């Protein structure tokens, strides 16, 4: 699989003075998990994030991804698009399990999928992302206990895996084009790098 279509473990970790704890910021195509009392932060437009944790141990994490457009078969569960989405979810879940989480204790909160990217309205990228994450978690038997999906506004999401608490701020006005440009660049990278290639799914 191309370097650009791999999910990367986020490396932007800093001290958040507002919440008085270490925090990890994740960008499109990244994920982060921890067993520590940390904060995970991201800003979502058309992308989606699944915040998944073991409700007993507090081991949890978050991803940030979008489904690439794979043409007419985009809604097929075996399309390149769905396979990439499955991969993005499985990478996070498998790392949680390796860190000591138990599958039967996993719960999820899901966010994003807004109609934010211009030119992507025809393919309803935000709606497809939102529906995919719902369907995936249902098939995997992971209960969604909260969601804030679709709409037209970007969101800033603060996730506290240890407690499961999430704070969501709707961004009704963007001061610059950073978010849109970042997601557009991510979408273009997914499109130009064949996601139908070698994607390994873990059992």
Curated annotation (Swiss-Prot):
Keywords: Chemotaxis, Hydrolase. SUPFAM superfamilies: CNF1/YfiH-like putative cysteine hydrolases. PANTHER family: CHEMORECEPTOR GLUTAMINE DEAMIDASE CHED-RELATED. Transmembrane segments: none annotated. GO terms for biological process: chemotaxis. GO terms for molecular function: protein-glutamine glutaminase activity. It catalyses: L-glutaminyl-[protein] + H2O = L-glutamyl-[protein] + NH4(+). It holds the Pfam family CheD. Belongs to the CheD family. InterPro entries: CheD-like_sf, Chemorcpt_Glu_NH3ase_CheD, Cytotoxic_necrot_fac-like_cat. This is Probable chemoreceptor glutamine deamidase CheD. Probably deamidates glutamine residues to glutamate on methyl-accepting chemotaxis receptors (MCPs), playing an important role in chemotaxis. The keyword Hydrolase applies. Its EC number is 3.5.1.44. HAMAP family: CheD. It comes from Herminiimonas arsenicoxydans. It comes from the Bacteria. The gene is cheD. Gene3D superfamilies: 3.30.1330.200.
């Amino acid at each position: 699989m191309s370097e650009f279509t791999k999910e990367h473990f986020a490396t932007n970790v800093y001290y958040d003075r507002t919440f008085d704890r270490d925090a990890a910021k994740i960008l499109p195509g990244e994920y982060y998990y921890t067993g520590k009392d940390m904060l995970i932060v991201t800003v979502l437009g058309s992308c989606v994030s699944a915040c998944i944790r073991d409700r007993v141990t507090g081991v949890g994490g978050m991803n940030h991804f979008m489904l690439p457009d794979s043409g007419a078969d985009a809604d097929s569960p075996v399309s390149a698009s769905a396979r990439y989405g499955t991969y993005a979810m499985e990478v996070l879940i498998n790392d949680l399990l390796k860190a000591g989480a138990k599958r039967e204790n996993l719960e999820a909160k899901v966010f994003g999928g807004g109609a934010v990217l211009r030119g992507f309205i025809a393919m309803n990228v935000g709606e497809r992302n939102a529906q995919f994450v719902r369907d995936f978690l249902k098939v995997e038997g992971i209960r969604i206990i909260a969601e804030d999906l679709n709409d037209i506004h970007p969101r800033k999401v603060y996730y506290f895996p240890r407690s499961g608490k999430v704070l969501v701020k709707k961004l009704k006005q963007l001061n610059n084009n950073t978010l849109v440009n970042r997601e557009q660049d991510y979408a273009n990278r997914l499109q130009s790098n064949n996601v139908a290639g070698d994607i390994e799914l873990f059992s």
